[in-house]
Amino acid sequence: MGQKINPIGLRLGVNRTWDSRWYADSGEYGRLLHEDLRIRSYVLEELRQAAISKVVIERPHKKCRVTIHSARPGLIIGKKGADIEKLRRKLSEMTNAETSLNIVEIRKPEIDATIIAQSIAQQLERRVAFRRAMKRAVQSAMRLGAEGIRINCSGRLGGAEIARMEWYREGRVPLHTLRSDVDYGTAEAKTAYGICGIKVWVFKGEILEHDPMASERRATEADQSGSSSNRRRENA
């Protein structure tokens, strides 16, 4: 099951949280959900070059708070904050509510699955060889601390007559383990031969604070490290 389902959806409530964080009665739920979809679609379309990973929407009472996670916050803010103020006004018009806008910088875009997928899609649109783009992304992610990464590219790769799927993996990506921190992202490359789809899984390690066995495992690891250090002192 872990191989088929979206890894983020599988881990909601375990070690991931929702990107839309609000509650509404049944009469308002549909309207607010479509409003969220319009906000995300508008932000991603207007700020295609800003390397946006995700858009988090929160709704306090009669207000709206939008948080954009981006690897290039300067492109969103603009000169003296002019662009971000223009974006805030547009989002206020879309929601008919007082809207605040926050920008969160992504420090390591090389291990963010969505940004990796967007980067590969842009390279394919510039006619870079898909194997080179995939291998470069894998090497960058592993160099910057990812424990594993898998990339799938599908479509008419390299202009082939028959569509196919190619994948590249390095390290380990445990999709069935719920405590594993697996990031997932997708993108589409609009090439001259058709649309190519890119899927990226990045394994960043295990999140143990939600695991009931975590304290016992940490104690065991501490005992093992302590005994090994004692042995080193005795040998010295």
Curated annotation (Swiss-Prot):
GO molecular function: mRNA binding; rRNA binding; structural constituent of ribosome
All copies of domain KH type-2, residue ranges: 39-107
Provenance organism: Bartonella tribocorum (strain CIP 105476 / IBS 506)
Gene Ontology biological process terms from the UniProt entry: translation
Record's keyword annotation contains rRNA-binding: yes
Protein's job: Binds the lower part of the 30S subunit head. Binds mRNA in the 70S ribosome, positioning it for translation.
A single GO cellular-component term on record: cytosolic small ribosomal subunit
SUPFAM superfamilies noted in UniProt: Prokaryotic type KH domain (KH-domain type II) (SSF54814), Ribosomal protein S3 C-terminal domain (SSF54821)
Protein name as catalogued: Small ribosomal subunit protein uS3
Alphabetized Gene3D superfamilies for the sequence: 3.30.300.20, Ribosomal protein S3, C-terminal domain
The keyword rRNA-binding is assigned to this record: yes
